[in-house]
């Protein structure tokens, strides 16, 4: 095994970024299992292609997610602050450092329509073969990447088509499993402890038109008068992970705790009885309840064996990001579940967003939900996560962060402008290779000068933002919960936006599915889904020599027993140190971290390398600063 040691003298802050070391790692969670769940339903191509009734049932109710902790109180206070500070829709000129390259928008087209009282809850996945599965609360649709529809107007009742599952179906999630070339859909059923189910659906092939193996897992697994809400999902090589929050029955909907299903993939793809376990009693290191844990699958679809990471932030406010690590397969007798916390700048939930009817001038609001993590991914010992947060005076902006596992630090940066609201961001890797930390972010946007729309922004390897780019402007305001039938209240929005990397694309590529204001007959002033291909314009490497920013000393060379690299950097930022062979192939990423102006030392055991010529490269952001030859001679 290649052994190395990194010594860095100091760390600091980067403008709107913050770096900190994590606190004590603490064991948490109680595992129950292993259990078995038989196949509930198997659908086929003929089931999908036959004429459907297109029935959909939705229940308008107030779950009160914003009542968790102090979320509702803070949001109400911030709305008054927002309205009393300047004219809504007039940006204050707040500067964001714009140096990253804006993505290109490729194929894009209209997707699912929303014909219910709910928010869209967009979820999207694309296979290596270019088949898109797009989900909203109303139903599911399939497309080719050129926009050709394979399946449209397919409600969730059409998809399940079983009389035993006759309650409302909601909160869909979909993921493409790159290791097995299959899709997985997770869908919730029922709003009470007696009807709550988690429907877990595995595509039979890489073509979703060939049908699904569908399992019904309990949404009240602990028999405590609870039902499950707001799922998040992720996969590793062997297993599917589903996190849900449990709430009590009406009318209080009191929070009951969060929990995780750990489910074997092989049985689901084969249509055999599922093997699964449950994790409960999950707490942060500072003894707060676990809540909405976002699994972090590998961001490039690479192998992730016998572990899964989960990221949490509090829904109302906080000064920590929490990371959970589950080690061990379902069958392992030595599974562990640990929690750690990383200090970040204090964040708070933002106020609800604004929208203005251009024909009447009526000012209405859109719910911006909570400040918890929207989604996350893992890549090369770094966890990437995204949320929205108050960027000032109650306005919503995007909050993006990284947790560097090697150095146990978190870095957070925000983007936004007071006068407009950016909400429900979703993140995907935009990397050229595993050493690249660039990301692409889809978002929704609204203010008093525009109708609800969606867009895209990127952050490069050095944590520089691109400019905002609108993908689809709104066609109309949203007015689903209209008076006099319902009291004036924030229109539902979100609860999440869909994004998925296309894993086999030659140039970094992702696909988004996001909500915009649209007329969806017979209903007007609702939401449509816009599906878009996002293509990176960042070159694989930007070779700009700036050796004046570094001084370097390597010894001994030729190397004998231990190799030592000393370097001084005169500019703070994210620094990477690569070890490459004579052909330029990556042998080892020695460092990927934020460094202040400092003197640094990297050491490793040269006995781990065969004799030959190597190159040590130092890179800051996208710029290669040093490339130094190293000779290994045992």
Please place each PLM-identified region on the residue numbering:
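Secreted/luminal cysteine- and crosslink-motif detector
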Residues: 9-11, 16, 295, 351
